[in-house]
Amino acid sequence: MEQTYQYAWIIPFLPLPVPMLIGVGLLLFPTATKNLRRMWAFQSVLLLSIVMIFSINLSIQQINSSSIYQYVWSWIINNDFSLEFGYLIDPLTSIMSILITTVGIVVLVYSDNYMSHDQGYLRFFAYMSFFSTSMLGLVTSSNLIQIYIFWELVGMCSYLLIGFWFTRPVAANACQKAFVTNRVGDFGLLLGILGFYWITGSFEFRDLFKIFSNLIYNNEVNFLFVTLCAVLLFAGAVAKSAQFPLHVWLPDAMEGPTPISALIHAATMVAAGIFLVARLIPLFIVIPHIMNLISLVGIITVLLGATLALAQKDIKRGLAYSTMSQLGYMMLALGMGSYRSALFHLITHAYSKALLFLGSGSVIHSMETLVGYSPKKSQNMVFMGGLTKHVPITKTSFLFGTLSLCGIPPLACFWSKDEIINDTWLYSPIFAIIAWSTAGLTAFYMFRIYLLTFEGHLNVHFQNYKNTPFYSISLWGKEGSKRINKNFPLLTLLTMNNHEIASFFSKKTYQMDQNVRNITQPFITITYFGNKNIFSYPYESDNTMLFPILVLVLFTLFIGFLGIPFNQEGANLDILSKWLTPSINLLHQNLNNLIDWDEFAKDAIFSVSIAFFGIFIASFLYKPVYSSLQNLDLINSFVKIGPKRIFLDKIINGIYGWSCNRGYIDAFYATFFTGGIRGLAELTSFFDRQVIDGITNGVGVLSFFVGESIKSVGGGRISSYLFLYLSYVSIFLLIYYFLDL
């Protein structure tokens, strides 16, 4: 066992040869490297698989022995200052390593086919492998400086991947927005690290926690300064995990390829913030105000993310806001001190969200045969619907992911979300009501995405109804036929204007600037699943894309049993609690207590009921449009024109405006922060040009005129110089004489 831990340092570096060899190959042998480009997918998967096996071995030893292993090397030693590099293997490290490697492998296999058409194929796999290296280095770090280095590398990789299609201005702006927003949090993180080093004199986690606890116990620190440093540390996690108010970069990050979205939202970038708070939880728990702040930010993010997802038209952005809300649940759990439930939800959400993103990628891939390469169309749920018969495997898989995120048993997210909601009742009834209500909103918007994508009829082929009052079928459309608005208020949710429908049926293919090439045979091939390519309709994805989706379905079905919250006499079924035995859990400090079946069933029924209510509302509002038209008179008999209907329309329009305008937070930032910074820049520029340059230029002009004046006085005659000299001396002597008097 000791030997296994000694070689754990190799974990972050195993995926690193792929980007290095690709870079060297493109530099020295560009033609050969590009011709053999499909080979790199296999090498990336192989190296990450080795890391996964290594991580599983470490995890088994962690579960059996509950040990913590740390190894450090001295890098810089100078008098009282020393900087060490090393690695730390504990339950948190082993959990994150398995999460990163398993999700990373399925995403890489999926990407081989998804990116086969792209000229940036080699660049994509180089970035992905380096992303895995950076994240693995982050989770194995043994001190704050090492974490900060890999933290910045993760941010750099996300910048490169979000802006992968940098020839598209929208993607270029998105990666810049993500980079700048994260710089705010990263600057706070750096200041917090330096602050705690100034307080404790150590960067190492174990020394830092011990010294800081003693200082707090003996009341030897400035509590205000300590709180400020802790807030700055937390700011880094807020930005990286897209928590309010630094969440604005997350929906724009969807401009990258879909496999990148799956990796970022499941196991890498957004998980880094949760990991950082979990790693520093022994530091935060001795500062009660910080724990309260963490839980407050978490509950705000839970509700905000859910409300922003309610009316999204872009399938990936809807899932992005879902990620934001679920990360809020994890942050809420950490703020409450429920360490176990936070990590449990991190695990279950990662596999479910990876499944949903890869499923959405399969849908987008199939829609591109109809609408061409145009993300505004291929990702727009307005054009979808009725995909069940065209992509049945993707549909079934997406349904499993949707039900899991809704919290329906026995799927993965049910177990973890239910545990967080139950813990919230112990912490704060107000927070519990918000968390419980948001679970219903989650079920509503997730099932809405599912219904608009797969149920009903294919909306692109809905042109037979374009001359009727009911032909338009957008999601929350603000503009629509007046005949519809007068007769049927619920169809205001399903309207769009006539000009948008005209371009639905264009046969023009929109290719990305210089980034698209002909599709070639994937390097990785999987057994046939029975998919057929019928290009007049969406078609099921290739086997290489379906296989990772089906693997994630298995994870979504069974990974929740890893943390079953009840044990029986003589049988310890709660593997996760056993795994986390050395860790801190404030709400459940005795994890060996047996939980009563009746109590568990009551809590589960309470949380599942709100999920089913959300699903019911979504099914009522977003059932197939054709069925709505057939039952139009029946529905109109219940919904009459009057004050109540006008009030309902105002609520719907308010929800639409709030969601589509991102809660007006981006507009607020653009007006006050961006506008304010630009105004300050213009003022600084004016001051520099008019004042600073004016002084410099004025001195130069004055010197010029003085020189010219002196030049005109001096004529080159020595007698004139002597006369002036004697005159000045005489004047000086007279002044000196009169002053002495």
Swiss-Prot record:
Q: Which major enzyme category is it?
A: translocase
Can you list the GO cellular component terms from the UniProt entry? chloroplast thylakoid membrane
Key words, A-Z: Chloroplast, Membrane, NAD, NADP, Plastid, Plastoquinone, Quinone, Thylakoid, Translocase, Transmembrane, Transmembrane helix, Transport
- Pfam short name (any one): Proton_antipo_C
The topology of this chain with respect to the membrane is: Multi-pass membrane protein
Keyword Cell inner membrane (UniProt): no
Q: Which reaction does it catalyse?
A: a plastoquinone + NADH + (n+1) H(+)(in) = a plastoquinol + NAD(+) + n H(+)(out); a plastoquinone + NADPH + (n+1) H(+)(in) = a plastoquinol + NADP(+) + n H(+)(out)
Q: A GO biological process this protein is involved in?
A: electron transport coupled proton transport
Kindly list the places in or outside the cell where this protein is found, as annotated in its UniProt entry.
Answer: Plastid, Chloroplast thylakoid membrane
Keyword NADP belongs to the record: yes
The EC designation for this entry is 7.1.1.-
One of the record's GO molecular function terms: quinone binding
Q: Which residues form a coiled coil?
A: none
Which parts pass through the membrane? 9-29, 40-60, 89-109, 125-145, 147-167, 185-205, 219-239, 258-278, 289-311, 318-338, 344-364, 396-416, 425-445, 546-566, 605-625, 721-741
Give the protein family. Answer: Belongs to the complex I subunit 5 family.
Known function: NDH shuttles electrons from NAD(P)H:plastoquinone, via FMN and iron-sulfur (Fe-S) centers, to quinones in the photosynthetic chain and possibly in a chloroplast respiratory chain. The immediate electron acceptor for the enzyme in this species is believed to be plastoquinone. Couples the redox reaction to proton translocation, and thus conserves the redox energy in a proton gradient.
Classification via NCBIfam families: NDH_I_L (TIGR01974), PRK06590.1 (NF005141)
Q: What is this protein called?
A: NAD(P)H-quinone oxidoreductase subunit 5, chloroplastic
Species in which this protein is naturally found: Panax ginseng
